[in-house]
Amino acid sequence: MTGCASRVESCPAANQTQPGAAYETLAEATYPEMAKYPDETAYMKKDGSFDDEGFSKVYDAWWADKRARRDIDIDRENVQSFVRASTGAMLGEECGKNFVYSPLNVYMALSMLAECTDGDSRAQILSLLRENRLEDVRAQAKALWNANYCADGAVTSVLASSVWLDDGVDYVRKTLDTLAQDYYASSFSGEMGSDSYNKALQSWLNEQTGGLLKDQASGLAFTPETVMALATTIYY
């Protein structure tokens, strides 16, 4: 899980990754289009007056989009319960270290993991997420993603997620489609531990964080024994 902050106003797109022959994109997330915040300077007329009508039309569209995301229904009590329970567990083991923990990233990753598991494993994850049904986890994760998403040209806030599978593992297409549609997560397949697959992971991380964490990303790699890996980032 990776996060970074920047004044960069462009949003790293999920479909920027260009897969090479060494690995395959199984499913690709598409981020929603968002109304752009109007540039006031673009509405200044040659005579020095301001095009209030034109500006207001664009601004109203932006505000309607912004308000709709603000009003997304989220089970806040559920999220707060997860944050309280997980923060102590995550940070308690890192006492004395310069450690950053994003409950939102972990919530998204665990929600995705619940989609990829079954039986007792899924039940344990659902319990940790304070939910009884996978459908509720799915709805909550999608709501959280959209409530925190912004790419209006003035503010950038993007949660990116991905699933990395070993090319010798069978997968369920429906699950990957669900991850792409409801979690905005892309899925890839390749040879675990290979240089090309490791570089693909690093490239994806750099794209999703605007290249601000290249040093950290360069040290991340899969082991040959890895069957599946989840990667999440937050860019704001």
Model-assigned labels for residue ranges:
Residues 39, 96, 103-106, 134-236:
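Non-catalytic, conformational "gating/processing" segments within enzyme and secreted inhibitor domains
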Residues 115-147:
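Active-site-surrounding "flap" and adjacent substrate/cofactor-binding loops of secreted or lumenal enzymes
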Residues 2-3:
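C-terminal motif of bacterial Sec signal peptides marking the signal peptidase cleavage site
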Residues 90, 112-117, 129, 148, ...:
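Generic structural signal for hydrophobic core residues of well-folded globular domains
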Residues 8-125:
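Flexible propeptides and autoinhibitory/regulatory segments associated with cysteine proteases
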